[in-house]
Amino acid sequence: MRRDIQQVLERWGTWARDNNTGIDWSPIAAGFKGLLPLRPSMRPSCSDEDGRIIDNCVSQLQQVRQPEELSLIIAYYVKGYSKRAIARRRRVDEGLIRAKLLIAEGFIDGCLSLLAVRLDMDPEVKMYSPQKSGKRISAVRKKFVNVL
């Protein structure tokens, strides 16, 4: 089953932010967590079971000594920073941030594939291949050949 890993991670990020999984650090001081009201997000989230599975895959980034990629996943998907903002903060090119995020997303997608587990969100994040029509493809080929 092919999944859109970015949609999976967006849902996981919402779940992780709302449930504070502790994969990064707690935004609330010890002992004060129950005193603040929960702020549910309007973004789509994943189930607790899916969240724990994805959490384990994300935490594997730290196990294989890739803490920078883990921090990018946390910054982008959990905290909601844009790729440009992350690049500015780290004083690096945005293309480098994009490349490292792609590597981290691929790693997490690979972990999920190795587990061969079916997620509750699979029907919503399934990658659909576009229907191929011979006429359209041949028309594109003709235009491409004419350009050359």
UniProtKB/Swiss-Prot annotation:
Pfam families attached to this UniProt entry: Phage_antitermQ
Residues in the signal sequence: none
Top-level taxon of the source organism: Viruses
GO biological process: transcription antitermination
InterPro entries, per database record: Phage_933W_GpQ
Keyword hit for DNA-binding: yes
Keywords: DNA-binding, Transcription, Transcription antitermination, Transcription regulation
A GO molecular-function annotation: DNA binding
Family membership noted in the UniProt record: Belongs to the phage antitermination Q type 1 family.
Function: Positively regulates expression of some phage genes. Bacterial host RNA polymerase modified by antitermination proteins transcribes through termination sites that otherwise prevent expression of the regulated genes.
Name of the protein in question: Probable antitermination protein Q
